[in-house]
Amino acid sequence: IVEISTDLDLFKKPIYQFDCIESLQLLKTLTTSYNFNENDGKIIGEHQGAHYYTIGQRKGLAIGGYKLPLFILSTNTQTNTIYVGQGENHGSLNRPGLFIPKNDIHWLRNDLELNIGEKVVYQCRIRYRQKLENVCLYMQEDGLHLIFENLQKAITPGQFATWYKNDELKIGLV
């Protein structure tokens, strides 16, 4: 288990507020995953396998002695490494958006499919029973950018993202 410090330059980037006219280059920068390695933090413990943990998880780490609780920020099952940070407001735990590759999008109706370059505002949730959040969707050739009005905690690969307009489910994907 590797702790990631909030003192890294990575977490000193400004948090941007979005409307539907922000540049697509900025979107690609903010929805890119960051790679961590052991040089970014320090080894603080051992675990039984990175595949047993999920982003945002707090319980089950069996590591204490920190001012704030530790949360899982990222896992790497190839190297069996878990990256953690202190506090639920850690810079890597809360994200303004996400990117969904084109092959992972599953449109419920073909007439709702967005064209390349098209953008639309819906309400979205990324976990069961989460309140609906305003989101701006930008369709690009390689996939879909979702930029939320509010930061989203622990966006995790494999989650559902569903969006709605007027309480009607428009799109769902994994």
What do these predicted regions represent?
Residues I1-V174:
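AMP-forming adenylation/ATP pyrophosphatase catalytic core
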